C-alpha cells in the first residue's frame, strides 16, 4: 500500500511540473516581423510598415517624444529620396526577451549603409532598436543611432556643389 501511495504521489508530482517559460530566443514570429520591417526599409516599401505596427503604436527614434506610424512613413519616403543603395550591411541581428510581466521585446542591431544620390559619398551608421509586441504587432519602438555621419556627408556634398558653382561663376566672368 505504501509503495502504491508513493508511486501515485511521484506520478502526480512529475505530471504537474510545468515546462518553464522560455524567456530568451533568437527565433520567433516577432523576430521575423523585425526582419520584414528592415526589408521594407531596404526595398522602400514604406506603406508596408502599416501592417507591422498597431494603429496607436508609439515610435521613439532618437527622441523622448513619440510619433505615429504615418510620420515614420512620410519621413522615410522623404529622406529616401536623397539616398541610393540603401541596405543593412551584414543583415540584422535580433533577440527576443519575454520579461517577468510577459511582455515580448525584440532587440535588434543593424549596420546601415547608404550612398548619397548624386555623389559617391557613403554613410554607415550603427542602429540599435527595441520593439514591444502585443497581439503580433509592434506597439512601441525605441531606436537610436548617430546622425553625425549623415550630416557630415550632406555638408561635404553641399560644399562640393558650392565650389563647383563658384568655379562656374568665376569662369563666366
Task: Tell me what each language-model feature is.
Residues 97-104, 132-139:
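A short, structured loop/turn motif at beta-sheet edges
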Residues 109-138, 145-148:
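Exposed beta-sheet edge and beta->alpha loop/turn motif
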Residues 17-46, 51, 161-173:
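Short, low-complexity N-terminal intrinsically disordered segments enriched in polar/charged residues
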Residues 37, 48-50, 57, 72, ...:
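Hydrophobic pocket/interface hotspot
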Residues 1-4, 19:
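Positively charged n-region of N-terminal signal peptides that target proteins for export
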Residues 45-98, 104:
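A solvent-exposed, acidic/Ser-Thr-rich amphipathic alpha-helical stretch
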Residues 4-14:
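Sec-dependent N-terminal signal peptides
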Residues 140-173:
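Low-complexity, intrinsically disordered terminal/linker segments enriched in charged
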Amino acid at each position: 500500500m505504501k509503495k502504491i501511495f508513493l508511486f501515485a504521489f511521484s506520478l502526480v508530482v512529475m505530471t504537474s511540473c510545468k515546462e518553464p517559460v522560455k524567456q530568451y530566443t533568437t527565433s520567433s514570429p516577432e523576430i521575423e516581423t523585425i526582419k520584414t520591417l528592415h526589408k521594407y526599409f531596404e526595398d522602400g516599401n514604406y506603406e508596408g510598415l502599416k501592417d507591422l505596427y498597431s494603429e496607436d503604436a508609439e515610435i521613439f527614434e532618437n527622441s523622448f517624444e513619440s510619433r505615429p506610424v504615418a510620420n515614420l512613413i512620410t519621413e522615410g519616403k522623404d529622406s529616401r529620396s536623397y539616398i541610393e543603395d540603401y541596405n543593412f550591411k551584414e543583415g540584422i541581428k535580433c533577440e527576443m526577451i519575454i520579461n517577468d510581466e510577459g511582455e515580448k521585446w525584440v532587440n535588434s542591431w543593424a549596420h546601415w549603409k547608404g550612398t548619397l544620390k548624386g555623389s559617391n559619398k557613403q554613410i554607415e551608421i550603427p542602429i540599435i532598436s527595441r520593439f514591444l509586441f502585443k497581439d503580433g504587432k509592434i506597439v512601441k519602438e525605441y531606436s537610436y543611432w548617430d546622425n553625425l555621419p549623415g550630416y557630415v556627408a550632406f555638408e561635404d556634398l553641399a560644399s562640393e556643389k558650392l565650389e563647383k558653382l563658384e568655379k562656374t561663376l568665376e569662369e563666366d566672368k
